[in-house]
Amino acid sequence: MPGPIVALTVDCTCALNGKCYVSGIVEATEQAIVPCTWLLGVSEHDPMSNVKLYHNEYLHRIPAWHEIGLYLSFDTGASNTVDRGDLIRVGKDILKQFSIKPTAFRAANGDLEAGDIKALEDIGILVDSTPGSSAELPKDAPRSPYHPSYTHPYQKGEAKLWIAPVAHVNGVRGYIDQGFDVLKAVIDAHLTLSDILVLGMTDCVDNRENLAHVIAYLKQKGARFTTLTQLVSEL
């Protein structure tokens, strides 16, 4: 029986948090020869800091076969879809200044609205991984990748982009920051629901040891590791 398909993702916001553990994540993934999707943070009140930091200090350390995507914070809680669409385009344009064309996306704090779906498609996003990345996830939300509705991002529909939700079980999200023991329970429970597993982590937490344990555990299960965009391209 084939093992699970796994996408590891990193929320890259360390410029705003004062601590950055990119090197440990790179080390763990290189030692295990697995790719990762790095989602570069752009925030409404400080759009450039994270991208500049990564460009100057870290992008040259991340293997070319990893993926670079966009992580966007709607800081003011703007509810007007036109304003949010403008922010999505700003995020794309900032990454474009550094020769990055993102096709993977995540909104901070699970803040994905229906009007965002079309705006994401318009800038070339192929896969969103917002659902499951925060504390809240509707119980009836799909656990495997799906095409969302244009009117409800947590329901299946006719949108062109995919949503690849982060593993989320009994109110616990699949983030490596929480430690291997917590994550092992999430992984085991999620794999009873889907053989596709998306896990998250943040770059402001020292995840090297936890990540190495998670990768080793999943390899024992015969897991195949991929990036978010490659994952949905195979569906």
PLM segments and residue spans:
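Generic structural signal for well-ordered alpha-helices
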Residues: V22-V26, H55-L59, G85-K92, I117, ...
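Glycan-processing catalytic domains of CAZymes
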Residues: T9, G69-L70, I125-S129
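Active-site beta->alpha N-cap acidic-glycine motif
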Residues: M1-P63
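C-terminal domain-boundary segment and adjacent tail
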Residues: P2, A32, T37, K184-L235
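Metal-dependent polysaccharide deacetylase catalytic core of the NodB/CE4 family, i.e.
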Residues: P35-G115, P131, A135-P138, A159-K160, ...
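Short, well-ordered alpha-helical microsegments
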Residues: G18, E113-I117, N207-L211
